[in-house]
Amino acid sequence: MTIKVVTFDLDDTLWPLRETILAAHKSANDFLASQVPSVKEILSTNKEREVWGQLIEKDPTMRHRLSELRFNVFKNILQSLGQTEQQAEKLSSEALQIFMNGRHQLTLFDGVEEVLAQLKEKYTLGVLTNGNADIKRLGIDHYFNFSFSAEELNDSKPSATHFKKAMEFT
């Protein structure tokens, strides 16, 4: 059998995730606390995680749409603190943008670009991710022939959906 397509996950495969997400999360939370000081009390407890769980329980497909889920967590918390829907949506949108900016401030593992360049010469390369990183925004999209995310497919690995989409490139 000849290998034609090589796929990659992104987080913790091409770059370390934990530090990046923690910094992005802190930036978004700091912004919200600067706008609504009482939010700090909720964001420093397990209440935030509880809201994540409640939203996923209410709509299980939300687990595939991390950006939308994060926005709704922010919005839910802000509204619980007395912000109007309009205020909560505005602040949540701004906080999500801050999070996404931070989420894309990362450093690839050593040698990643060199290896991708070598593999690109011989194989079709693709991305299959449950995360919400944007390879175009990261400037590495030129290495890949395709990219599928859980948000885009409304399904998460290890479900077969991602892999079936990748097979379309064989």
Question: Over which residues does each language-model region extend?
Answer:
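Active-site phosphate/pyrophosphate-handling residues
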Residues: 72, 114, 161
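Structured loop/turn residues at beta-strand edges in well-structured enzyme cores
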Residues: 1, 121, 142
